């Protein structure tokens, strides 16, 4: 079994405002597990100041190195070592799931897994101006989301309540 990872700097389509700041880029790691010519890929990803296992890049890569070495030596995931680091655990579990699926990207045969339907349970609306948030909210509601999460704190509280009243009016 061969295990390694690669990192990519991803760019948000538009700035993502949170209570901890605004994100324009996102560093993500992809773990690749290969056995008998079959590859499994899993994403290990955190958001600084939001994810419980966010840390300096060098420390994160050191943990990834240790986890990859363990997997290569044992053929298994070091669950106890990775419990405090759910992003790395998720990436390895996803890579193994794809490996078990003989390299197929279709990890589950569901409408979502086949790309036929989205999961409409958490439509996230990032912080922005009132108009930006209202437009994003409208798009989520039109897309059929039944649960919408608003990132609040960027605008006047009364204006944020206006957004909540709008949601309630749509479902009354």
Which positions does each model-derived feature cover?
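N-terminal capping/lid subdomain adjacent to the active-site entrance of alpha/beta enzymes
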Residues: 1-172
């Amino acid at each position: 079994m061969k295990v390694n990872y690669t990192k990519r700097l991803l760019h948000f389509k538009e700035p993502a405002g949170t209570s901890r700041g605004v994100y324009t880029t996102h560093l993500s790691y992809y773990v690749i597990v290969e056995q008998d010519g079959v590859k499994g890929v899993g994403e290990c990803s955190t958001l600084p100041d939001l994810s419980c296992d966010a840390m300096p890049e060098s420390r994160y890569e050191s943990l990834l190195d240790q986890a990859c070495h363990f997997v290569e030596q044992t053929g298994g995931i070091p669950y106890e070592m990775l419990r405090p680091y759910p992003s790395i655990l998720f990436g390895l579990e996803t890579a193994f799931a794809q490996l078990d699926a003989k390299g197929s990207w279709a990890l589950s045969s569901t409408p979502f897994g086949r790309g036929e339907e989205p999961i409409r349970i958490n439509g996230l609306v990032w912080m922005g101006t009132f108009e930006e948030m209202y437009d994003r909210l409208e798009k989520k509601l039109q897309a059929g989301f039944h649960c919408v999460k608003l990132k609040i704190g960027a605008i006047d509280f009364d204006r944020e309540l206006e957004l909540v009243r709008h949601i309630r009016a749509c479902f009354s």
